[in-house]
């Protein structure tokens, strides 16, 4: 069965850590492709700093040179709150022959009990769990709540890049460079669109 990874997020902005973890998961799990899915509105995040279409454009620019990466507009076109379960159900219906792998950071997975229809999600998707620097996942407690994760997940050590979109926005607001932190095409787009200014 073909394996495809999904990396969802606000990507506000997308940066090299996103790309590095996607590539790590692709290689370690033998994924034929990684699909980046920018969210329209995440239920656990209150604010976006750029529009969904600007974040979509930055994501397309960031992955342009990797043929194993693609972008889906499924959540942007849906608009409203983006629930992962809705996306996975749609992907399963459209392409039932694919084994879908959610690529998630350990810090995000720690909040799984707060995700909409989390138990259904664990039945439909597999999880590629990337360790987040400075965050220790309480794996036994998570398995107590979601025992099926033991068979439907792989923990990946991966590249430990302590880089966040919050930090990048702060740098941009302070007039500091983000070169070598985001792809050049993304940096150019941010400057052209005058994003993340104070």
Curated annotation (Swiss-Prot):
GO MF entry, a single one: nicotinate-nucleotide adenylyltransferase activity
Taxonomic superkingdom: Bacteria
Protein keywords: ATP-binding, NAD, Nucleotide-binding, Nucleotidyltransferase, Pyridine nucleotide biosynthesis, Transferase
E.C. designation(s): 2.7.7.18
Swiss-Prot/TrEMBL catalytic activity: nicotinate beta-D-ribonucleotide + ATP + H(+) = deamido-NAD(+) + diphosphate
Pathway membership, UniProt: Cofactor biosynthesis; NAD(+) biosynthesis; deamido-NAD(+) from nicotinate D-ribonucleotide: step 1/1
CDD domains: NMNAT
Keyword ATP-binding annotated: yes
Biological process annotations from GO: NAD biosynthetic process
Family of this protein: Belongs to the NadD family.
Biological role: Catalyzes the reversible adenylation of nicotinate mononucleotide (NaMN) to nicotinic acid adenine dinucleotide (NaAD).
PANTHER family per UniProt: NICOTINATE-NUCLEOTIDE ADENYLYLTRANSFERASE-RELATED, PHOSPHOPANTETHEINE ADENYLYLTRANSFERASE
Listed name of the protein: Probable nicotinate-nucleotide adenylyltransferase
Organism name: Herpetosiphon aurantiacus (strain ATCC 23779 / DSM 785 / 114-95)
């Amino acid at each position: 069965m073909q394996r495809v990874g999904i990396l969802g997020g606000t990507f506000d902005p997308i940066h090299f850590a996103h790309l590095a973890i996607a590539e790590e998961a692709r290689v370690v799990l033998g994924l034929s492709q990684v699909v980046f899915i920018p969210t329209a509105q995440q239920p656990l995040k209150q604010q976006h700093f750029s529009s969904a279409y600007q974040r979509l454009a930055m994501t397309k620019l960031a992955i342009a040179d990797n043929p194993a990466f693609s972008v889906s507009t499924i959540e942007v076109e849906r608009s409203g709150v983006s629930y992962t379960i809705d996306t996975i159900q749609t992907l399963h219906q459209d392409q039932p022959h694919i084994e879908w792998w959610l690529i998630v950071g350990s810090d995000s997975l720690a909040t799984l009990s707060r995700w909409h229809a989390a138990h259904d999600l664990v039945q439909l998707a597999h999880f590629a769990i990337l360790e987040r620097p400075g965050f220790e996942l309480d794996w036994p407690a998570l398995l107590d709540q979601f025992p099926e994760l033991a068979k439907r997940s792989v923990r990946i050590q991966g590249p430990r890049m302590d880089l966040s979109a919050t930090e990048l926005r702060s740098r941009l607001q302070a007039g500091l460079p983000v070169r070598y932190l985001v792809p050049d095409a993304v940096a150019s787009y941010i400057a052209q669109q005058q994003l993340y200014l104070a």
